[in-house]
Amino acid sequence: MTKIFLNGSSSKPVNAYAFLNWYFEDQKNANSILQNKQVDSFQFFIMGNSYIASSLYLLKNILDKYNKYNVADYLIFPIFFNLTHGLECWLKASISSITYLYNDVEEFKFTHELKDLTSDLKKLLGRYNILYIFDDLSSFALIDSLVDELNQYNVRFDFARYSSYRNNSQFYCGNNNVCVDLYELFQFIITLVYSFRLSLSYLILCIDSAVQPDQEDFILFCENKANYKDNEDDEDAFENFIFKDV
Protein backbone atom coordinates (compact mmCIF):
# COMPACT_ATOMS: atom_id res chain seq x y z
CA MET A 1 0.00 0.00 0.00
CA THR A 2 1.22 3.50 -0.84
CA LYS A 3 2.12 5.58 2.21
CA ILE A 4 -0.25 8.39 3.10
CA PHE A 5 2.07 10.23 5.49
CA LEU A 6 5.37 11.33 3.98
CA ASN A 7 8.42 13.05 5.47
CA GLY A 8 9.72 14.34 2.17
CA SER A 9 8.72 15.16 -1.37
CA SER A 10 8.15 12.79 -4.25
CA SER A 11 7.51 13.08 -7.96
CA LYS A 12 3.98 14.42 -7.51
CA PRO A 13 3.25 18.16 -7.85
CA VAL A 14 3.23 20.15 -4.62
CA ASN A 15 -0.54 20.74 -4.76
CA ALA A 16 -1.03 16.98 -4.46
CA TYR A 17 -0.18 17.22 -0.76
CA ALA A 18 -1.59 18.71 2.42
CA PHE A 19 1.12 19.89 4.80
CA LEU A 20 0.05 19.30 8.40
CA ASN A 21 2.98 21.34 9.70
CA TRP A 22 2.44 24.38 7.46
CA TYR A 23 0.59 26.52 10.01
CA PHE A 24 2.27 25.02 13.07
CA GLU A 25 5.99 25.15 12.24
CA ASP A 26 6.79 27.91 14.74
CA GLN A 27 4.38 26.80 17.43
CA LYS A 28 5.88 23.82 19.18
CA ASN A 29 4.91 23.92 22.85
CA ALA A 30 7.62 25.36 25.06
CA ASN A 31 8.40 24.45 28.67
CA SER A 32 7.33 27.84 30.01
CA ILE A 33 3.73 27.98 31.24
CA LEU A 34 3.39 31.57 30.00
CA GLN A 35 4.76 30.58 26.61
CA ASN A 36 2.34 27.66 26.48
CA LYS A 37 -0.58 30.07 26.80
CA GLN A 38 0.71 32.04 23.84
CA VAL A 39 1.18 28.88 21.79
CA ASP A 40 -2.23 27.56 22.83
CA SER A 41 -3.86 30.75 21.57
CA PHE A 42 -2.31 30.44 18.12
CA GLN A 43 -2.96 26.72 17.86
CA PHE A 44 -6.59 26.89 18.97
CA PHE A 45 -7.13 29.79 16.55
CA ILE A 46 -5.65 27.92 13.58
CA MET A 47 -7.41 24.67 14.38
CA GLY A 48 -10.71 26.49 14.82
CA ASN A 49 -10.23 28.15 11.43
CA SER A 50 -9.73 24.78 9.75
CA TYR A 51 -12.87 23.24 11.22
CA ILE A 52 -15.05 26.26 10.44
CA ALA A 53 -13.67 26.40 6.89
CA SER A 54 -14.52 22.73 6.44
CA SER A 55 -18.13 23.37 7.46
CA LEU A 56 -18.37 26.24 5.00
CA TYR A 57 -16.89 24.19 2.16
CA LEU A 58 -19.33 21.35 2.69
CA LEU A 59 -22.33 23.66 2.96
CA LYS A 60 -21.33 25.71 -0.09
CA ASN A 61 -20.93 22.57 -2.18
CA ILE A 62 -24.31 21.23 -1.09
CA LEU A 63 -26.11 24.51 -1.72
CA ASP A 64 -24.47 25.06 -5.12
CA LYS A 65 -25.67 21.62 -6.23
CA TYR A 66 -29.13 22.08 -4.69
CA ASN A 67 -28.55 19.23 -2.25
CA LYS A 68 -28.44 16.69 -5.06
CA TYR A 69 -29.26 13.15 -3.90
CA ASN A 70 -30.07 14.64 -0.47
CA VAL A 71 -26.42 14.31 0.53
CA ALA A 72 -27.01 16.82 3.33
CA ASP A 73 -28.73 14.10 5.34
CA TYR A 74 -25.30 12.47 5.69
CA LEU A 75 -23.03 15.48 5.60
CA ILE A 76 -24.94 17.52 8.18
CA PHE A 77 -23.17 15.60 10.94
CA PRO A 78 -19.58 16.50 9.97
CA ILE A 79 -20.85 20.01 9.18
CA PHE A 80 -22.18 20.42 12.72
CA PHE A 81 -19.23 18.65 14.31
CA ASN A 82 -16.80 20.96 12.51
CA LEU A 83 -18.88 24.01 13.41
CA THR A 84 -19.20 23.25 17.12
CA HIS A 85 -15.63 22.02 17.51
CA GLY A 86 -14.28 24.97 15.54
CA LEU A 87 -16.27 27.36 17.71
CA GLU A 88 -15.00 25.58 20.81
CA CYS A 89 -11.44 26.14 19.56
CA TRP A 90 -12.13 29.83 18.90
CA LEU A 91 -13.55 30.31 22.39
CA LYS A 92 -10.55 28.58 23.95
CA ALA A 93 -8.21 30.68 21.81
CA SER A 94 -9.93 33.83 23.08
CA ILE A 95 -9.62 32.75 26.71
CA SER A 96 -5.97 31.77 26.30
CA SER A 97 -5.22 35.06 24.54
CA ILE A 98 -6.65 37.23 27.30
CA THR A 99 -5.04 35.25 30.12
CA TYR A 100 -1.71 35.55 28.30
CA LEU A 101 -2.01 39.27 27.49
CA TYR A 102 -2.94 40.16 31.08
CA ASN A 103 -0.94 37.42 32.81
CA ASP A 104 -4.15 36.15 34.41
CA VAL A 105 -3.54 33.16 36.66
CA GLU A 106 -7.13 31.96 37.07
CA GLU A 107 -7.58 28.31 36.16
CA PHE A 108 -10.67 27.64 34.08
CA LYS A 109 -12.22 24.20 34.11
CA PHE A 110 -11.69 21.91 31.14
CA THR A 111 -14.91 21.66 29.14
CA HIS A 112 -16.34 21.16 25.67
CA GLU A 113 -19.55 23.03 26.48
CA LEU A 114 -19.99 26.21 24.43
CA LYS A 115 -22.17 27.78 27.11
CA ASP A 116 -19.51 27.39 29.81
CA LEU A 117 -16.70 28.60 27.56
CA THR A 118 -18.74 31.63 26.53
CA SER A 119 -19.43 32.46 30.17
CA ASP A 120 -15.73 32.23 31.06
CA LEU A 121 -14.78 34.50 28.16
CA LYS A 122 -17.40 37.10 29.04
CA LYS A 123 -16.08 37.16 32.60
CA LEU A 124 -12.53 37.84 31.39
CA LEU A 125 -13.66 40.59 29.03
CA GLY A 126 -15.47 42.34 31.86
CA ARG A 127 -12.54 41.90 34.25
CA TYR A 128 -10.16 43.79 31.96
CA ASN A 129 -12.69 46.26 30.56
CA ILE A 130 -12.26 45.07 26.97
CA LEU A 131 -15.86 44.24 26.13
CA TYR A 132 -15.54 46.56 23.13
CA ILE A 133 -13.45 43.92 21.34
CA PHE A 134 -16.58 41.82 21.05
CA ASP A 135 -18.87 44.81 20.39
CA ASP A 136 -19.98 44.96 24.02
CA LEU A 137 -21.07 41.30 23.84
CA SER A 138 -23.12 41.69 20.63
CA SER A 139 -20.65 39.33 18.95
CA PHE A 140 -21.87 36.67 21.34
CA ALA A 141 -25.47 36.99 20.13
CA LEU A 142 -24.98 34.35 17.44
CA ILE A 143 -23.32 31.92 19.84
CA ASP A 144 -25.99 32.51 22.47
CA SER A 145 -28.74 31.90 19.91
CA LEU A 146 -27.10 28.65 18.82
CA VAL A 147 -26.71 27.49 22.42
CA ASP A 148 -30.36 28.37 23.11
CA GLU A 149 -31.53 26.33 20.12
CA LEU A 150 -29.42 23.37 21.16
CA ASN A 151 -30.74 23.61 24.71
CA GLN A 152 -34.30 23.38 23.41
CA TYR A 153 -33.49 19.84 22.28
CA ASN A 154 -31.33 19.05 25.32
CA VAL A 155 -28.41 18.56 22.95
CA ARG A 156 -25.15 17.03 24.16
CA PHE A 157 -21.82 18.45 22.96
CA ASP A 158 -21.13 15.19 21.06
CA PHE A 159 -24.48 15.05 19.21
CA ALA A 160 -22.79 15.28 15.80
CA ARG A 161 -20.09 12.77 16.69
CA TYR A 162 -22.10 9.88 18.12
CA SER A 163 -25.75 8.94 17.63
CA SER A 164 -25.91 7.35 21.09
CA TYR A 165 -24.30 7.63 24.51
CA ARG A 166 -24.35 5.20 27.42
CA ASN A 167 -27.84 3.71 27.26
CA ASN A 168 -29.47 6.63 25.44
CA SER A 169 -29.86 7.95 21.90
CA GLN A 170 -29.32 11.49 20.70
CA PHE A 171 -32.33 13.78 20.32
CA TYR A 172 -32.69 13.22 16.57
CA CYS A 173 -33.06 9.44 16.80
CA GLY A 174 -36.77 8.66 16.41
CA ASN A 175 -39.75 9.22 14.16
CA ASN A 176 -40.10 13.00 14.31
CA ASN A 177 -38.37 15.17 11.71
CA VAL A 178 -35.57 17.42 12.94
CA CYS A 179 -34.68 19.64 9.97
CA VAL A 180 -31.82 22.07 9.46
CA ASP A 181 -32.15 25.10 7.19
CA LEU A 182 -28.93 24.78 5.19
CA TYR A 183 -28.96 28.32 3.82
CA GLU A 184 -29.56 29.86 7.26
CA LEU A 185 -26.78 27.72 8.70
CA PHE A 186 -24.41 28.90 5.96
CA GLN A 187 -25.28 32.55 6.65
CA PHE A 188 -24.89 31.92 10.37
CA ILE A 189 -21.30 30.75 9.91
CA ILE A 190 -20.44 33.59 7.51
CA THR A 191 -21.73 36.11 10.06
CA LEU A 192 -19.82 34.34 12.82
CA VAL A 193 -16.61 34.81 10.82
CA TYR A 194 -17.25 38.54 10.41
CA SER A 195 -18.11 39.09 14.05
CA PHE A 196 -16.59 36.69 16.53
CA ARG A 197 -13.58 35.58 14.49
CA LEU A 198 -12.75 39.17 13.61
CA SER A 199 -12.61 40.03 17.31
CA LEU A 200 -10.50 36.98 18.08
CA SER A 201 -8.08 37.76 15.24
CA TYR A 202 -7.45 41.16 16.87
CA LEU A 203 -6.48 39.42 20.11
CA ILE A 204 -4.13 37.16 18.16
CA LEU A 205 -2.58 40.26 16.54
CA CYS A 206 -2.06 41.79 19.99
CA ILE A 207 -0.17 38.69 21.10
CA ASP A 208 1.93 38.70 17.95
CA SER A 209 2.71 42.41 18.45
CA ALA A 210 3.30 42.03 22.21
CA VAL A 211 0.80 44.77 23.09
CA GLN A 212 -2.39 44.86 25.11
CA PRO A 213 -5.70 45.68 23.38
CA ASP A 214 -6.53 49.32 22.70
CA GLN A 215 -9.95 50.54 21.62
CA GLU A 216 -8.71 52.98 18.97
CA ASP A 217 -6.40 50.35 17.50
CA PHE A 218 -9.28 47.89 17.43
CA ILE A 219 -11.47 50.35 15.50
CA LEU A 220 -8.72 50.83 12.91
CA PHE A 221 -8.25 47.08 12.70
CA CYS A 222 -11.96 46.55 11.97
CA GLU A 223 -11.99 49.13 9.18
CA ASN A 224 -9.91 46.77 7.06
CA LYS A 225 -12.21 43.79 7.48
CA ALA A 226 -13.36 42.01 4.33
CA ASN A 227 -16.91 41.62 3.09
CA TYR A 228 -17.65 38.35 1.32
CA LYS A 229 -20.62 38.35 -1.05
CA ASP A 230 -21.70 35.14 -2.71
CA ASN A 231 -21.27 35.74 -6.44
CA GLU A 232 -22.13 32.78 -8.65
CA ASP A 233 -20.15 34.31 -11.53
CA ASP A 234 -16.94 34.47 -9.51
CA GLU A 235 -15.74 30.93 -8.89
CA ASP A 236 -12.72 32.10 -6.90
CA ALA A 237 -14.58 34.46 -4.55
CA PHE A 238 -15.40 31.79 -2.01
CA GLU A 239 -11.91 30.25 -2.07
CA ASN A 240 -10.37 33.70 -1.59
CA PHE A 241 -12.71 34.31 1.33
CA ILE A 242 -11.70 31.01 2.96
CA PHE A 243 -7.99 31.67 2.41
CA LYS A 244 -7.98 35.28 3.61
CA ASP A 245 -10.70 35.40 6.24
CA VAL A 246 -11.09 31.90 7.64
Question: What does each model-identified segment do?
Answer:
Residues 1-246:
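Domain-scale activation on soluble regions of proteins
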